[in-house]
Amino acid sequence: GFDFARHPYPELAARFMEHYNAGVPGCAVTAHAVDTLQTLARMGWQQAVLSASRRDYLIEQVSARGLQGFFTELLGLADIYGVSKVQLGTDYLRRTGIDPAACVMVGDTDHDAAVAAAIGATCVLYTGGHQSRARLEKASPYVIDDLAQLPALLETI
Protein backbone atom coordinates (compact mmCIF):
# COMPACT_ATOMS: atom_id res chain seq x y z
CA GLY A 1 0.00 0.00 0.00
CA PHE A 2 0.84 3.64 -0.06
CA ASP A 3 1.62 5.83 2.90
CA PHE A 4 -0.32 8.94 1.95
CA ALA A 5 1.20 10.79 4.90
CA ARG A 6 4.61 10.45 3.22
CA HIS A 7 3.38 10.57 -0.38
CA PRO A 8 0.11 12.50 -0.70
CA TYR A 9 -2.31 11.16 -3.30
CA PRO A 10 -2.24 14.35 -5.44
CA GLU A 11 1.55 14.02 -5.71
CA LEU A 12 1.32 10.34 -6.70
CA ALA A 13 -1.44 11.04 -9.21
CA ALA A 14 0.60 13.80 -10.85
CA ARG A 15 3.68 11.56 -11.11
CA PHE A 16 1.60 8.71 -12.52
CA MET A 17 0.10 11.00 -15.17
CA GLU A 18 3.55 12.28 -16.18
CA HIS A 19 4.64 8.72 -16.92
CA TYR A 20 1.31 7.75 -18.48
CA ASN A 21 1.19 10.76 -20.82
CA ALA A 22 4.79 10.20 -21.89
CA GLY A 23 3.78 6.79 -23.27
CA VAL A 24 0.56 7.85 -25.00
CA PRO A 25 2.11 8.88 -28.34
CA GLY A 26 3.42 5.33 -28.77
CA CYS A 27 -0.03 3.78 -28.39
CA ALA A 28 -1.64 2.79 -31.66
CA VAL A 29 -5.37 2.53 -32.27
CA THR A 30 -6.54 -1.02 -31.49
CA ALA A 31 -7.00 -3.40 -34.42
CA HIS A 32 -10.38 -3.02 -36.15
CA ALA A 33 -11.33 -0.02 -33.99
CA VAL A 34 -11.72 2.42 -36.88
CA ASP A 35 -13.67 -0.05 -39.03
CA THR A 36 -15.92 -0.83 -36.07
CA LEU A 37 -16.52 2.84 -35.32
CA GLN A 38 -17.43 3.38 -38.98
CA THR A 39 -19.79 0.40 -38.97
CA LEU A 40 -21.51 1.52 -35.78
CA ALA A 41 -21.98 5.01 -37.21
CA ARG A 42 -23.57 3.51 -40.37
CA MET A 43 -25.83 1.41 -38.12
CA GLY A 44 -27.03 4.60 -36.46
CA TRP A 45 -25.38 4.16 -33.08
CA GLN A 46 -24.63 7.41 -31.27
CA GLN A 47 -21.14 7.11 -29.79
CA ALA A 48 -19.55 8.95 -26.89
CA VAL A 49 -16.42 8.33 -24.84
CA LEU A 50 -16.66 8.07 -21.05
CA SER A 51 -13.21 8.11 -19.48
CA ALA A 52 -11.47 8.60 -16.16
CA SER A 53 -8.88 10.60 -18.09
CA ARG A 54 -8.78 14.32 -17.70
CA ARG A 55 -10.97 15.79 -20.44
CA ASP A 56 -8.23 17.89 -22.05
CA TYR A 57 -5.98 14.80 -22.24
CA LEU A 58 -8.84 12.81 -23.73
CA ILE A 59 -9.56 15.40 -26.42
CA GLU A 60 -5.88 15.49 -27.34
CA GLN A 61 -5.60 11.68 -27.48
CA VAL A 62 -8.72 11.23 -29.62
CA SER A 63 -7.81 14.11 -31.96
CA ALA A 64 -4.23 12.91 -32.43
CA ARG A 65 -5.62 9.65 -33.80
CA GLY A 66 -8.19 11.31 -36.06
CA LEU A 67 -11.14 9.76 -34.22
CA GLN A 68 -13.00 12.86 -33.03
CA GLY A 69 -15.58 12.68 -35.84
CA PHE A 70 -16.99 9.41 -34.51
CA PHE A 71 -18.08 10.74 -31.13
CA THR A 72 -20.88 13.08 -30.17
CA GLU A 73 -19.18 13.79 -26.88
CA LEU A 74 -15.88 13.15 -25.08
CA LEU A 75 -16.65 12.82 -21.38
CA GLY A 76 -13.57 13.18 -19.23
CA LEU A 77 -12.89 14.38 -15.74
CA ALA A 78 -11.94 17.89 -14.72
CA ASP A 79 -8.82 16.71 -12.88
CA ILE A 80 -6.33 13.82 -12.79
CA TYR A 81 -7.74 12.06 -9.76
CA GLY A 82 -10.23 9.82 -11.59
CA VAL A 83 -12.95 10.32 -9.00
CA SER A 84 -16.23 9.34 -10.69
CA LYS A 85 -16.99 8.01 -14.14
CA VAL A 86 -20.37 7.02 -12.71
CA GLN A 87 -21.28 10.63 -11.96
CA LEU A 88 -19.99 11.77 -15.34
CA GLY A 89 -22.05 9.12 -17.14
CA THR A 90 -25.16 9.75 -15.05
CA ASP A 91 -24.94 13.50 -15.66
CA TYR A 92 -24.52 12.94 -19.41
CA LEU A 93 -27.55 10.66 -19.65
CA ARG A 94 -29.68 13.04 -17.61
CA ARG A 95 -28.55 16.06 -19.65
CA THR A 96 -29.17 14.38 -23.02
CA GLY A 97 -32.36 12.56 -22.03
CA ILE A 98 -30.93 9.27 -23.27
CA ASP A 99 -32.53 6.20 -21.68
CA PRO A 100 -29.77 4.27 -19.87
CA ALA A 101 -31.50 1.00 -20.80
CA ALA A 102 -30.88 1.86 -24.47
CA CYS A 103 -27.14 2.35 -23.86
CA VAL A 104 -24.32 -0.11 -24.31
CA MET A 105 -21.02 0.71 -22.66
CA VAL A 106 -17.96 -0.91 -24.22
CA GLY A 107 -14.97 -1.23 -21.92
CA ASP A 108 -12.02 -3.43 -21.08
CA THR A 109 -12.11 -3.77 -17.28
CA ASP A 110 -14.40 -5.10 -14.60
CA HIS A 111 -14.56 -1.51 -13.36
CA ASP A 112 -16.15 -0.55 -16.67
CA ALA A 113 -18.81 -3.21 -16.04
CA ALA A 114 -19.43 -1.75 -12.58
CA VAL A 115 -19.79 1.74 -14.06
CA ALA A 116 -22.23 0.46 -16.70
CA ALA A 117 -24.31 -1.27 -14.02
CA ALA A 118 -24.34 1.86 -11.88
CA ILE A 119 -25.64 4.02 -14.72
CA GLY A 120 -28.11 1.38 -15.93
CA ALA A 121 -26.40 0.48 -19.22
CA THR A 122 -25.59 -2.89 -20.74
CA CYS A 123 -21.85 -3.62 -20.81
CA VAL A 124 -19.71 -5.31 -23.45
CA LEU A 125 -16.14 -6.01 -22.39
CA TYR A 126 -13.19 -6.29 -24.78
CA THR A 127 -10.28 -8.59 -23.93
CA GLY A 128 -7.67 -6.27 -25.46
CA GLY A 129 -6.98 -4.53 -22.15
CA HIS A 130 -4.94 -5.70 -19.18
CA GLN A 131 -7.53 -7.94 -17.50
CA SER A 132 -7.99 -11.61 -18.33
CA ARG A 133 -10.98 -12.97 -20.22
CA ALA A 134 -11.91 -15.03 -17.15
CA ARG A 135 -12.04 -11.91 -15.00
CA LEU A 136 -14.09 -10.03 -17.59
CA GLU A 137 -16.54 -12.93 -17.95
CA LYS A 138 -17.28 -12.67 -14.23
CA ALA A 139 -18.25 -9.02 -14.74
CA SER A 140 -20.35 -9.20 -17.92
CA PRO A 141 -22.10 -11.85 -20.03
CA TYR A 142 -20.90 -10.03 -23.14
CA VAL A 143 -17.16 -10.40 -23.79
CA ILE A 144 -15.45 -10.01 -27.17
CA ASP A 145 -11.89 -10.71 -28.29
CA ASP A 146 -11.95 -8.49 -31.36
CA LEU A 147 -13.71 -5.15 -31.81
CA ALA A 148 -14.90 -6.40 -35.21
CA GLN A 149 -17.26 -8.69 -33.27
CA LEU A 150 -19.08 -5.74 -31.70
CA PRO A 151 -21.57 -4.78 -34.46
CA ALA A 152 -22.95 -8.32 -34.75
CA LEU A 153 -23.18 -8.66 -30.97
CA LEU A 154 -25.08 -5.38 -30.70
CA GLU A 155 -27.71 -6.77 -33.07
CA THR A 156 -28.44 -9.50 -30.49
CA ILE A 157 -28.50 -7.46 -27.29
Give each language-model segment a name.
Residues 1-6, 61, 92-93:
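Helix-loop "lid/cap" segments that line or gate small-molecule binding pockets
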Residues 63-65, 77-78, 86-92:
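Anionic-ligand binding region
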Residues 10, 68-83:
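A short, structured active-site edge motif that brings together acidic residues
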Residues 104-143:
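Acidic, Mg2+-coordinating phosphoryl-transfer loop and its flanking beta/alpha structural elements
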Residues 85-114:
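Conserved Lys-Pro-Asp/Glu-containing loop-to-beta segment of HAD-superfamily phosphomonoesterases
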Residues 6-8, 69-73, 100-104:
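Short acidic capping loops at alpha-helix termini that bridge into adjacent secondary structure
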Residues 32, 57-60, 115, 135, ...:
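Phosphate- and divalent-cation-binding pockets in alpha/beta enzyme and binding domains
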Residues 10, 18-49, 55-62, 86:
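Short, acidic loop-to-helix structural element flanking the phosphoryl-transfer center
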